[in-house]
Design a protein with these regions (language model features):
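Outer-membrane beta-barrel initiation region
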Residues: 2, 22-123, 127, 134-135, ...
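Detector for outer-membrane/organellar transmembrane beta-barrel domains
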Residues: 157-218
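Outer-membrane beta-barrel "beta-signal"
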Residues: 233-238, 268-282
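Repeated loop/turn-to-beta-strand initiation elements of outer-membrane beta-barrel proteins
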Residues: 108-112, 139-143, 170-174, 199-204, ...
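Extracellular loop and loop/strand-boundary signature of outer-membrane beta-barrel proteins
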Residues: 116-119, 148-150, 161, 176-178, ...
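Residues that define the transmembrane beta-barrel architecture of outer-membrane proteins
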Residues: 76-78, 94-98, 125-129, 156-160, ...
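Transmembrane beta-barrel strands of outer-membrane/channel proteins
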Residues: 84, 113-117, 145-149, 176-180, ...
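Residue-level signature of outer-membrane beta-barrel architecture
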Residues: 104-106, 135, 166, 180, ...
Length: 282
């Protein structure tokens, strides 16, 4: 047997030879082209097939000319609201009342239509229609001007109308309109309402309306000054936003010379009425 020292020396020589062989193999370049290697030294995966350079045709295909972007600033819209379509009871007679507003146009210029009135099973007591041009002069307010035609009571009257309408602070919807008729007869009307959301669908709507006249009109039993006022509360439930039945109550009162004309004709000067109706828009 070989001495222990000789065996140790042979083992060391074999180890050194193996190390040199591995180093030589590592120094020999790989036969696989770099672009076909699957991973870099850091371990990042590389594509097997090289990526061709980006051309102008590639850019044009990725970003085609889409033309102008469509806008809606010139589009014509329309809206119709039956704010009141109701049956009233509790006064001298049972009546059906309506109050409808509609418009057609854009964000700034609109053509407005308003109509309201009262009828019973026998005849039309009150009825009027207004055609107005409206122009927005701020984000929340419109200027309106046009014509109003009174159908009832007799005799019929035609008025020039001018006013403003919009959303006041605290979200009160307001309409204030002045009217000028024949022989410089003047009238004015102020309306305001507010929507209180009890829930997202149950809404309480207080509303007030005041009417004034510049001078007496005996033919229509209207005195000068404050002629009449109406306050009301309506509670509606919106099954859909476009359709909501409601119940409510209203208080009507006549003042001054208008009240005198009513008393002379045997009519009451104030009344409390209960209301059932439908509010709808489209």
């Amino acid at each position: 047997m070989l001495p222990a020292r000789l065996r140790l020396l042979l083992l060391m020589l074999l180890a050194v030879g193996a190390t040199d062989t591995l180093a030589q193999k590592a120094a020999i370049p790989s036969a696989v082209p770099p672009q076909q290697q699957q991973h870099t030294v850091q371990g990042i995966q590389q594509p097997v097939t090289p990526i061709p350079p980006l051309t102008e045709e590639d850019r044009a295909a990725a970003f085609p000319d889409l033309g102008g972007h469509p806008t809606h600033d010139k589009k014509v819209f329309s809206f119709v609201l039956f704010d009141q379509l109701e049956w009233r009871t509790g006064g001298e007679t049972e009546t059906v009342n309506w109050d409808m507003t509609g418009w057609i146009g854009g964000d700034v210029h609109r053509l407005w239509f308003r109509t309201e009135g009262e009828t019973d099973e026998k005849r039309l007591h009150e009825g009027e229609a207004q055609l107005l041009y409206g122009r927005a002069f701020s984000r929340w307010w419109d200027f309106v001007a046009g014509v109003r035609q009174d159908i009832r009571p007799d005799p019929a009257r035609t008025w020039a109308a001018i006013g403003i309408q919009g959303l006041a602070p605290q979200f009160f919807e307001v309409r204030a309109t002045a009217y000028v008729g024949a022989s410089w007869q003047t009238q004015a009307r102020f309306e305001a309402e507010y929507e209180m959301l009890i829930t997202n669908r149950l809404i309480l709507q207080p509303r007030v309306e005041f009417n004034l006249s510049g001078k007496s009109d005996p033919e229509r039993s209207i005195g000068s000054g404050l002629t009449s006022a109406e306050e009301g509360l309506r509670l509606r439930y919106e099954f859909r936003r476009e359709f909501a039945p409601y119940v409510g109550i209203s208080w009507n009162q006549k003042f001054g010379g208008t009240a005198d004309f009513a008393r002379a004709g045997g009519e009451a000067t104030r009344a409390t009425r209960f209301i059932v109706g439908i509010r709808a828009w489209f």
